[in-house]
């Protein structure tokens, strides 16, 4: 599983950087795992140069048996009886008059649990769009009601590939509602907005990175299989959000180094964290093209002959919508280690006051996969 988590994290960091280049100060929220899974399903049907580009950009070329590894990861993540709700769901919607290869359909079903729903894009594209949106709405508990806006599919559409991820988890240590106060959140050196600032003082895995002047805090969810990890600069020192230094240094190796469990220690932390909701929508086509996935979106060059045997398919858009709601109880998100016990008197007390922009991610600890990744820079 380690190869896959390394590949997925590598891609997550690259995509975050690409989104940051397009919008250096706004909020970001994505599910890298959801996007990787969707592209892995497409990868099953790509051939030639198209396959090579997808494989390189998503680091699939570093993973043996990529599809069976995704299959195990999906099983691991969607496992019943967990103290949180986490669902990763895949589906294909194909034009009913179009012939998809039986091999391709069998593989997507086996590896990704994605069945093919036949729809009438040709005669009734609007009905097909509504059907797809209804399915996504159901998979995300109503949090993503309209993945595809009007006009996004038409009578030329042959295939829509949908991946939805939904997460709802309660904190291992909840914030007391009565401790939440209105407080200023600094967007940059001069502007502030008011937020509902939550507070608690408990023992959490924590670290301070000297050369970055940055605090790292891990907030585990019930059961401790999932955690939210937050990177918070000491202060806003640049002319932007205060995150420039971290974002410039953000690589797979650095992110792992900063946040791996063995580099954190248990501390008594005064945590101030804003309550927030983010809903983001992306057409990832241009961002993926920047990472080297180009032929896939080009009508003349795309080779998806592993899906149909013909060369007439291409991907017109990759749409990603995500939702996160973080509050005192825990986190609701859609996009669809044993601590050492120390004597209380030896425990350092730390302050973690997230009253200015920070980067956060939700990690599946057993597999070290990043389920969600974001930047909170403005309420």
Curated annotation (Swiss-Prot):
PTM remark: The N-terminus is blocked.
Keyword Nucleotidyltransferase attributed: no
Residues marked Reactive bond (site): 344-345
InterPro entries linked to this entry: Serpin_CS (IPR023795), Serpin_dom (IPR023796), Serpin_fam (IPR000215), Serpin_sf (IPR036186), Serpin_sf_1 (IPR042178), Serpin_sf_2 (IPR042185)
Region span, CARD-binding motif (CBM): 351-379
Highest taxon listed in the record's lineage: Eukaryota
Molecular function per GO: serine-type endopeptidase inhibitor activity
Keywords: Acetylation, Cytoplasm, Endosome, Lysosome, Protease inhibitor, Secreted, Serine protease inhibitor
Function: Neutrophil serine protease inhibitor that plays an essential role in the regulation of the innate immune response, inflammation and cellular homeostasis. Acts primarily to protect the cell from proteases released in the cytoplasm during stress or infection. These proteases are important in killing microbes but when released from granules, these potent enzymes also destroy host proteins and contribute to mortality. Regulates the activity of the neutrophil proteases elastase, cathepsin G, proteinase-3, chymase, chymotrypsin, and kallikrein-3.
Assembly and interaction partners: Monomer. Interacts (via C-terminus) with CASP1; CASP4 (via CARD domain) and CASP5; these interactions regulate the activity of inflammatory caspases. Interacts with PRTN3. Interacts with GZMH. Interacts with TMSB4.
Family: Belongs to the serpin family. Ov-serpin subfamily.
PANTHER family: LEUKOCYTE ELASTASE INHIBITOR, SERINE PROTEASE INHIBITOR, SERPIN
Name used for this protein in its record: Leukocyte elastase inhibitor
Encoding gene per record: SERPINB1
